[in-house]
């Protein structure tokens, strides 16, 4: 559930992009970054390896203005796609308000997509969450 701070009149919402390695999660955030005016978006932070793969996460803060007098902010994160970074994937899901699952469109990546989706469900379960309790987009 989004964090609502009544004292500062702010709503903060955490959206996590989840999926396989090189499936398009970072590309999604880069596209959003390029489409929004600098006053709306913050600086995009990306921790990538030498091969340009996400090492820990990408982060893009958005300030979407006011909703009924509350300043509305979104924090967009990507998880690393590689299974060996599962601890990072799990940590980034902590406090999630919504998920965008980015499936790789290549036919030969279908099994990896399924494994990544199952991994996401397992990691959500660590926080007592299911796909029935968190809004998501596939």
Language model region names:
Residues 2-51:
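Conserved G1/Walker A P-loop phosphate-binding module
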Residues 6, 65-68, 123-131:
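Alpha-helix termini
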Residues 27-32, 95, 112-120:
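Alpha-helical scaffold elements adjacent to nucleotide-binding pockets in ATP/GTP-utilizing enzyme cores
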Residues 28, 78, 100:
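Residue-level signature of catalytic and energy-coupling elements of molecular machines
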Residues 45-85:
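Switch I (G2) and immediately adjacent beta-strands of P-loop GTPase domains
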Residues 85-108:
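Inter-motif core of Ras-like GTPase G domains
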Residues 97-101, 125-138:
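Conserved beta-strand/loop subsegment of P-loop NTPase cores
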Residues 108-130:
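Amphipathic helical hotspot of TIR/SEFIR-family domains
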